Regions:
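Aromatic- and Gly/Pro-enriched, solvent-exposed loop/edge beta-strand patches characteristic
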Residues: 371-456
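Short, surface-exposed beta-strand/loop patches at domain edges
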Residues: 429-502
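Acidic glycine-/aspartate-rich tracts in secreted/extracellular proteins
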Residues: 99, 106, 146-150, 227-230, ...
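N-terminal secretory signal peptides that target proteins for export/translocation
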Residues: 1-14
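N-terminal zymogen propeptides
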Residues: 32-75, 169
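Boundary/junction segments of secreted and surface-exposed precursor proteins
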Residues: 30-35, 72-76, 311-343, 502-534
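Short, composition-biased motifs enriched in small/polar/acidic residues
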Residues: 502-633
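Predominantly the structural core of cysteine protease catalytic domains
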Residues: 67-74, 78, 94-102, 114, ...
Length: 633
């Protein structure tokens, strides 16, 4: 007999996993022998499992080297940055993710960079104490929405350097982060445009080769492991228990011939992974590097990941998306038990409104299958808040291809699509090929708040025999159902990337006559005047470049009363060669409550509306009118 609502069963399990996660997340120390060290990996409430497509060799871009070498060390190629020290906080996941990005920059000839782990940990936006830990899914969400990566010099880990607090001085370290020096949203130094997910290790040569191929191709992979209770000897570590992962580290190589006799507890055979830890250079006997046995029962068992920075061709101006928290859940057919939604879901779509004159240049999509054929369609001038994402629209572009790996992929369009100011457009993703039941990725209300509205995100299945496609709105909670009396919504994991074509209506260099000229500034998703969780300082960034490529300056005013100039918050924005810088006056202190006067869905004639500050941090895109002025640096 078919269960009445299998989605409710799955969701309740996820809810129980969330409760378990919250109860255990505060434990962020690993006991190894007589020593205690901070860890910080926490499993997501719902396990997103990637799958290997039929006939696919692996989910990475496999190198053609056959066979794989018996050993590899990315340090030999100059691809690894120095070992860092997370002590005494549970932030290992940010160190693992940033270490991978730093390796990509070295590998591609862009030099050595030191990225900020503190900024990612404090501004991830997920539920729970930031010291409770994280995972690759959380890192992906933070990076793909362009909240990072940020330079260490712009938001240092500790004022006196890493390791300045002892392993038991967590309270003092947290006080510095939360009170003395909270993080604020910053313009990212690098945009992340791709995430490669590597299949979990399961003891087979096939999955072992998947990870080896990823290491050779990308130099480093962020992995999860169990470090509490690990038997250690010298620089060799081995865990053979059944407890869950509690630590995130970076794997940079392997050695098939690493002797089993090197381990305190002898594993069944030779071979080990070479990893870079985040406990400083005095950790172990190899300067903070370790060898973890191939036979470790927990190493590499939670969606290992590679984070790829944008190439110069991918350095887009703005990102649109409602999936602020990334791939939290996978949307499949059995999640909805409401006629006529019985066919496998193979469609998802998002609807956006352009903030100014710009060109749609690329789209981005999450995928859980190692090889997945797709069709992407772009519709312009679609009807807002319609039953389908294509209603009233004109097909502007259609592109087909195959996603070659699990994770997130940015797909450039064959040619940019011009978007006039306030154009409503949709991105429609359709699975093609034989495996149309591949789960669709979405952000849900699990350990985060996506704040989705009707008419923004859709899921559906393709019509057959001439029938129309069937769609449901991801914010239609009557259909999506409820979890223990809590409404949930599903935001499709689809993004749109644009290049700006707006030009100044007057001079665009300080000193020329630009006073009083109006323009629209698109303030990107999570960095857009987002209310800082720790303190009362607002941060924002905008991309406004003049017709001749020179700097365009702008002010934006906000306060309790827009008619009172003494109650205004002035934000000055400068963009030089595509890199924005900010200044604002006055500093917002804890003594006052500020309401942000912004513009939501700006009509042609303007029309200001009140936007409470506590709503800004959960809003996907918001656009503000700014006034150009003759500002000087």
């Amino acid at each position: 007999m078919k269960e009445k609502n299998p989605y409710r069963r799955h969701a309740k399990k996820a809810f129980l996993r969330l409760v378990a996660m919250i109860c255990t997340a505060a434990i962020s120390m690993a006991a190894v022998g007589d020593d205690v060290r901070p860890t910080g990996f926490r499993p997501p409430p719902h396990r997103i499992k990637i799958r290997r497509a039929e006939g696919a060799k692996d989910s990475t871009k496999r190198l053609k080297a056959t066979p794989l070498p018996s050993s590899w060390d990315s340090r030999d190629h100059g691809w690894v940055t120095p070992v860092k020290d997370q002590n005494p906080l549970g932030t290992c996941w940010t160190f693992a993710a940033n270490a991978v990005i730093e390796t990509q920059l070295l590998r591609t000839g862009r030099g050595a960079w030191d990225l900020s782990e503190k900024n990612m940990a404090l501004l991830s936006g997920f539920e729970g104490d930031w010291n409770s830990g994280g995972n690759n899914d959380m890192a992906s969400a933070h990076l793909l929405r362009w909240s990072g990566a940020v330079m260490e010099t712009n938001d240092v880990y500790f004022t006196n350097g890493e390791g300045s607090y002892g392993k038991y001085e967590v309270a003092s370290a947290k006080r510095e982060w939360e009170t003395t020096r909270p993080s604020v949203p910053l313009d990212p130094t690098f945009h992340i445009q791709h995430v490669i997910l590597v299949p979990d290790l399961d003891g087979t040569e096939e999955t072992r080769n998947d990870l080896k191929s990823a290491i050779m191709e990308y130099g480093a992979v962020a992995v999860a492991a169990r470090w509490t209770g690990t038997s250690q000897q010298g620089c060799s570590a081995y865990y053979n228990g059944s407890s869950g992962c509690d630590h995130a580290i970076t794997v940079i190589g392997w050695d098939d011939n690493w002797p089993a006799s090197n381990f305190a507890i002898v594993p069944p055979g030779n071979g080990a992974w070479l990893i870079k830890n985040s406990w400083g250079t005095n950790d172990g006997t190899a300067g903070g590097y370790w060898y973890v046995s191939y036979h470790d029962t927990r190493f590499g068992t939670y969606n290992s990941a590679v984070f790829i920075p944008a190439t110069p061709e991918e350095n887009y101006t703005a990102v649109y998306g409602y999936d602020k928290f990334g791939c939290i859940y996978d949307f499949v057919q059995e999640h909805v038990d409401n006629p006529p939604y019985y066919d496998p879901f193979d469609l998802m779509a998002t609807v956006f409104t352009s903030g100014w004159n710009e060109e749609l240049a690329a789209v981005g999509v999450y995928n859980l299958l190692s090889s997945s054929p797709y069709e992407i369609s772009i519709y312009t001038n679609v009807t807002r808040n319609a039953e389908t994402p294509t209603t009233g629209g004109v097909l502007a572009c259609q592109v087909t291809g195959t996603l070659s790996h699990a994770g997130f992929t940015t797909i450039p369009l064959p040619a940019p699509i011009p978007l006039a100011e306030r154009t409503t457009f949709s991105v429609v993703y359709r699975q093609t090929g034989s495996e149309r039941s591949n789960p669709l990725c979405c952000t849900s209300d699990y350990y985060c708040y996506p704040n989705l509205n009707l008419g923004q995100s859709y899921f559906g299945y393709s019509g057959t025999d001439g029938e129309e496609d069937v769609w449901i709105d991801g914010a239609n909670k009557e259909i999506i159902n409820k979890v223990d009396s809590t409404d949930v919504a599903w935001a499709a994991c689809l993004k749109a990337y644009t290049h700006t074509t707006v030009t100044a209506k007057a001079g665009d260099t300080p000193g020329e006559t630009a006073d009083g000229t109006e323009a629209l500034a698109a303030l990107a998703a999570t960095n857009a005047l987002a209310y800082a969780q720790h303190g009362e300082t607002f941060g924002a960034f905008a991309h406004i470049v003049g017709a001749n490529g020179r700097t365009l300056w702008a002010n934006w005013l906000a306060g309790l009363d827009p008619s009172n100039p003494n109650d205004d918050f002035t934000l000055s924005i400068a963009v030089t060669n595509g890199v924005p810088s900010l200044s604002w006056t006055p500093d917002l202190g804890d003594a006052r409550t500020y309401t942000i006067w912004g513009c939501r869905d700006l009509p042609p004639a303007g029309g200001w509306s009140v936007v409470p500050k506590d709503k800004l941090s959960t809003t996907t895109n918001r656009f503000f009118k700014v006034t150009l002025e003759n500002s000087q640096p």
